[in-house]
Amino acid sequence: MASKTAERILAAALTLFNEQGENAVTSVDIAMELDISPGNLYYHFKGKEQIIDGLVHWYSEAMQTLLRPATLEKVQAEDFFYFIAIVLDKQQLFRFMYRSPADLAEKYPKVKHWHKQQIRQLESSLTKLLLRFAAQEALLASSAEQRLMVDLIIMILTQANQYDDLRNIDDPQAQKFHALSLMMTALLPRFRLQETTVAQLRKA
């Protein structure tokens, strides 16, 4: 279990990375943000790579909890886009990982491994959900179309932030709702939901 100081270091690093980008923040910047000495920070983390590893672990734990079978079993077709909104909320907490993922993966091997692992986990979880919805006749999509829907969802989840950054849209909530709107526009017509449910989703 990480010490309170280590957790404070990770929380401060996460804030700075999200605000300024990982590349613009040094270990000294993180120490100054916390008003501790660089030596104190070094005692807990021997450089930025270990800090990044700690943040990857935090994010992995959050996503594993969200994507575990017991959680997925509770997600019904009418809940799907709310579920995606929660995934986006988790993602926005660690949005620096999606700003320049290729650069991060090149610098930090664990990030590259984590991105691949996350995509596989999302593919598996989303595939199971859509397959169940189709079996319940709550989704009109063939197996091939379901695979493409999974690809589309993951592409938006992993790439939309970069697109928004290029358009100077850096507000986390705006980025979240843009990604969610893209998915709803493309996928909602495939779902067989009650009109009241669809109306609520469009207003959310």
What are these regions (language model features)?
Residues 110-136, 144-158, 162, 178-186:
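Amphipathic alpha-helical packing segments from all-alpha helical-bundle domains
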Residues 8, 16-54:
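Helix-turn-helix
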Residues 67-70, 98-105, 133, 160-168:
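Secondary-structure edge/capping motif, primarily at the C-terminal ends of alpha-helices
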Residues 57-63:
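Short, basic, alpha-helical segments at the C-terminal edge of helix-turn-helix-like DNA-binding modules
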Residues 68-96:
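Hydrophobic alpha-helical connector segments
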Residues 128, 162, 166-204:
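C-terminal peripheral helix-coil segments that are non-catalytic and often amphipathic
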Residues 5, 9-12, 149:
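N-terminal positioning helix adjacent to the helix-turn-helix/winged-helix DNA-binding module
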Residues 91-113, 127-131:
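Amphipathic alpha-helical segments used for helix-helix packing
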